[in-house]
Amino acid sequence: MATGVLIKRVTSHGEDAKVLLPHIVELRALAVRQPGYISGETFFNLDHPEECLVISRWTTLEHWQQWMQDPRRIELDGNMEKHLGTKTEYNVYGIGLW
């Protein structure tokens, strides 16, 4: 089953979430080369500029889980940590009709 992942990041000290964009672009450039990657979208909250939401789509949950364990992803994600006021929130959903 296709998998959608909502990734929410909130920057610290009122810092605009757009500071995360170079890191997100770098992560996506790596993700597009991973097995099972379908697409990704990035949203910046207009009412709360410190908040960013990424929606990532994968062909299977297993592909997403493999990506989460990728050492390069872990390193790039760690580069964003200095900007974050809270822990990155991941919510994984199945895509489709039952």
Residue locations for each model-derived region?
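Generic recognition of well-ordered alpha-helical segments
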Residues: P22-E26, G78
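Active-site-flanking beta-strand signature of metal-NTP-handling nucleotidyl enzymes
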Residues: T3-V10
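Flexible, low-complexity linkers/stalks enriched in Thr/Pro that connect modular domains
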Residues: F43, V92-G94
